[in-house]
């Protein structure tokens, strides 16, 4: 080893100086340890004296750095230890306040002396030239200094390697291992302190840990603890993983290897080859030590054994710069000893048992010969660092015989001294060997020369001796240069060194510290178990847990518990620890502040291992209760980390019923809630200026996070146990209910409370109609206690925390997880719905805020659990539904039979597949139950159901009142960019479920209908891509489709989740849905003789002339005219016949878009087989029908009942190939289409039905469709369903057509309609451009396969018979079949649906001619042309016809011409007002100025500075003869006399803003400037005093800076921010729902409507009338008559820069304004101004407009402009086209040509003109005609009907209004009467 001493020739001067210094330091140290002076001044002087002494000692060391005296280092260590002892006496062993004590100050002083610290931490420990005593003293001093290190010091690699080698040194035992020794050697001291320093190095992790793990050190340390603790005799240790005698290269390679984790390491030990060496060492001295005159102890075992230590290489002498202290390394990972002062205790500074060793002069050696021998030994030790030892037969030792004398010893001494000198100078091995050779040659040469000259052998030996002494002296001189210090005359004193027992105690502690760091690694487990580590830990725990005389625990106890915690991470160790009653030992540990962390760490480590916790839970109940009690006490302790560990223990242990029961038995829930309540109270930030996230410290956040997680686990476990306890028992095999033997979960078995398991429980509670009602009625004490303690309020308080960091983010998730479980019971829902937080916020508002998308930021991990809570609050589960399971998905029809067909039972039982054949309550197929709750017929069920309904109703009202609809609609936005891809569909599906629950309320359903939610949902369904059902995305898409269709069925009044709603979702407008609904409800009748005539034609065309004649004769029919006789092209046997379709006159071709939509093509050779196939099919269907139906359909029936089947029908068939067309095609078209329709339905109903119809994984018998019977089942759909199912099973057998159901993207889908009532069919008549894939993969809509539109269908390439393989496949039994009557009725219904205005009462419909409902002629309407209207007004009617005024408005207010501009180069205009009747305009500027301009000349008349802030609003009002002007800024309001503003304002109003006059001008309203208050202040204009204050007391986040105050026309009502006040009563009247973040709006001049952003509300009923998308985000102004609305893009008036915000620039109205008809809210025009629009103003005569536009956004320059209304910009060749007669006709033609563009919403987009071209020539007509036509149909809530493309509503005449009377009845505020009155007055 490199810890050997030098061989040195004494230098008396150096020794004396160092001895004097050490003696003086020790003497002063003894004086400094006396009693402290109580006076402050003397204490300061003592402190200064100590620092001076320490400084002096350091200087003494640094001055002789090459040859330091270890006693000085020991003196400095003694100084630190004495001060540490004083600190411990004053503060105890666990204080961390050393920094302010003398002990800490001395350590800091040493640490900050870079030169000295470099010596003791690197140079002395890494250089081989320093003695063991110096290294031991340095290590001792470093350990004393480490007490105050904030971070672990990072030692050099060479130093850490030496630490490891010294600890691993086998030649030296650990202190205390040899009981015979009483004194500690330097090497033992070095080994002990190296162990401590190694523990410090391991704390910084890194490569040193890898090296130590592979070195077998852990086994050595554990063995020592075993010997010390268990008092077992020391034996040879074999736990080393490497041989000691290895080369340097091997060691370096081993260091770089990464350790491998192995299962066992017990066999990886190599027996050391020289294990008997220790016995041989005792021949020299015990443990191989020499004492030289009692001064120093040197280990010379290497000399005696003639063995070279492998670690004593020259690798540490590579580069001196390597040993420089790297200051950056000393700032490590964390605080080591300040935070855990228990690691250094009295053991670090033992005060007893010191060994006193006197320094003696080397000259007192009595025997020079012995001294020479020792010198030789030392020299040999110095040379022992060579890798290759010089052998006795070495060349340099040859020729040492002089005569008879042998001078080999002298030569060896000289060689050793020379090589030692060379190596001390860091010379390489070759140079050292050369030096040795030279010294040998010198000695031999001197002897030979003397012998030759004198011939005397004695003289030759003397000469050789002198030469050898010369070499040795030279080496000593070079090694020990003379360093004379200051004069010191004091005698040498004695130094205090730790005795053997003190070192043994320190060694024990350092071993524990090392193992506590290494214990978590698997490599340590084997050695620990081999050395009885479990017993050692238990004994240590028991021994250190004993209290001493001062009732304090052992300082070693925290380290022992840390060691147990580290080793308990291994299951093997933990299991043995529990088996050997280690838990009881832990429970016996004193519970004081010093042990809290260790106890909590052990509990958490054991609790996190479920296998170990099973053993713990199997212990006696008393022990389990004590464990839980201990964890609860730790929750209340003062240490944060211990509290966190305890919370984590509970979170991991709550999966065991034993822990759960013990926890509840001690009423411990209050402890968890108390922690969370404290965190919630801190989170509110009371009495602090910091924000909520900053109020909570990091530790508080972590504690709240862990506690909330534990609470969620607690409720999850309770939920699982409760459901298990109430789960309906199944019948055992013996017929005895299993409830007779309750299956109680074992208390020691873990519960599965994972996310998947909890989701499965909630799904079961939702679906199971037995378990659901039982769960509602069950008592849940845990939740009741939680609610009684206001735990739900605490959770909501925590949910208000913004998720700004990870802990708060996860805290919200767990809090919502708790609320999700709590709201599953009625009491929890009621408590949450009525909860009010400390800041007066509603609990529902907090949940909605968490689910809100703010600033396009989507956090699905927060939104999803929040939506789950909302679902529990507003959505009754289907298991509590009042409706039967099957009726859940189908809207009942009057007269429908309530009993299910007998086939339903068979289908229901077969569809269960492998389910147990036990009676199971049928589950509801929907996702949300009905409004009515049904809990069975038990006692009290009705009352409880009523209470549940009331709670759900209150929750819905609370969600609506807190803008819940707006938040949920945001989640349905088509573009939500979040990851993973399934997340948007998940959030949308959950949001739809919440909306579906809200829609159980009729009022909310009506609102959703008006908001056209169905249209948004249809877009979502079409956008969702087809994903595999096995993925999360596919699952969420399927659920989204299901719940969206169910919601559409409610908001469109078209039933629940049926195929009809699929059609509704695919339809772009509600108008089409209503039209289909009217047609479906219309009874259809027809003349049966016309049908017989068609059959007669069909028979003739088929070549059955005799049969046709017989029919003609028997039915007494008159044949159709010959012109109507059909050509036989459809059924010809010759392929050459190709008569055009226009010439074909067969009956079905008479109807335009009739029975077949595609062009028939024939093929001769396919006629007969298909005819036979259809004949067989018909016979089989007839047989099946006769065997199952009780009421067979009559064969001959002259008059079929009308309206027998309210069913839709597909009138078109796939394109048939010419060679495939035959008579069977007519028979197969309907069943083929119907089959495909039915297979679409299950995918949008229940999950079970969707699975049974998706693929052929189930038997064909399970793939049936349950259909409730119609009022007349014999005549309805029984035959249809049979054929459908026959064909479906055939198709399912063909795997090539099995593809998943998918929606086409962004394409229009066909309408679907019910063919019987429950089993709705797909009506594909109106589909043009899309296809649908049914459950078997076939594309269903025949219209999509039309030759002109689609050619991709495989079905269209073959005949139905060959496609479906009817002849060859067996047909299953089917009780229903198609009838000719149903086919005809469906065909006629389809024709009726195509009518533009279908009516509900029809005469018998002709089969021979196309059916078209009569349309209004609109003869009384005013002409579209303006000239025509003027002429009509003069000649025919005083009002020029119906809608004359409306079309005049559209004509006038679509034309605007720039008239004049007003600029001021020095001002930025912000607002404008037109002063009526004065020809003046007033503008406000950003500088706070008010400027008056003359309108006619554009010159500025007056300018005055009235505000300190930018002017935001100016509003004029004429009061008698005075023109008043009201100006506002962000801080005050000024009232001016507009006739002379230079005289100053009439009055100033501070503390208010955004003022607006009332309509009477007697008052004005303003808003309070205080951001925290929501007050509307009313002032009297005459007295200028406040007259009223209206306050919005609801604390919500709905307020926005855009809202202004609005007065009603009669000034009695006030509207602001969606809140309506009546000035005559103190409270608010109404809070309107807001569906966007843009508040504002205003009162309609008709007084019956109020506008909130884009929604129109009825003032009389407070119902939503309609939604006008054109008004979204706009600020509106009415013209003077109140029949036209001007809309400009809303902005924050207090910030002019907000006008040019990036998002605002992209809006279409950024540089434009819009005009709308205020009667029906239809768009008139969108007028571009090509500049950013800031403000807008009107004047009473409706002749001019005033605008403020920003001319230059970069320079922020704006101007005011005035526009003429009703005039257009002159063109290049015509100055005024409105006055030019030559262009009038052309203008009118343009207007008529652009009518369609206006209907399509394209009005106002023509901006080809220049900056002043504000005309809109294509906006003379309005889209309102559609609206008024729809008013009669669906309550007047439709805004417009979009033209859908070719072959659809062409709009000719459809846009005209035919229901003005209905409109006036439904909307009294629409003002149509005003039009008539105005016309009358004008006449």
UniProtKB/Swiss-Prot annotation:
Assigned protein family: Belongs to the VPRBP/DCAF1 family.
Modified-residue entries (Phosphoserine), positions: 349
Biased composition (Low complexity): 1238-1251
Subunit structure: Component of the CUL4-RBX1-DDB1-DCAF1 E3 ubiquitin-protein ligase complex. Interacts with DDB1A through its DWD motifs.
The protein, known as: DDB1- and CUL4-associated factor homolog 1
Swiss-Prot/TrEMBL domain comment: The DWD boxes are required for interaction with DDB1A.
Key words, A-Z: Nucleus, Phosphoprotein, Repeat, Ubl conjugation pathway, WD repeat
Function: Component of the CUL4-RBX1-DDB1-DCAF1 E3 ubiquitin-protein ligase complex, DCAF1 may function as the substrate recognition module within this complex. Appears to be required for plant embryogenesis and to affect several other developmental processes including leaf, shoot, and flower development.
